[in-house]
Amino acid sequence: MTIYALSSGPGISGVAIVRISGKETSKVLKLLTDKDLPKPRVATLRKINYINTSELIDEGIVLWFPGPESYTGEDMAEFHIHGSKAVIDALHHSISKVENCRLAEAGE
């Protein structure tokens, strides 16, 4: 199972970081950005869209960490997006539409 969560913590902020880890990470990155994977461990500016549409969620920094050389040991990515609740919720909702992806539980 691929899991995702807000890793920068809740609350008001200018930037939020959403981390995703697991087998479907590369698929999610490609679907959300409509592009090939960025170079590993290189911060890349990308437009982030709702899955299967061209409707923009946000424009932010994307980082790709292929496993096993990642923090989790699995394929992992980070989305550095604007910190509004609406943007965070839209990204979470879009990721949830990918099969085998779910919101992480506490401590995962």
Predicted region positions:
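A glycine-rich (often HGG/GG-containing) alpha/beta subdomain
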Residues: M1-E108
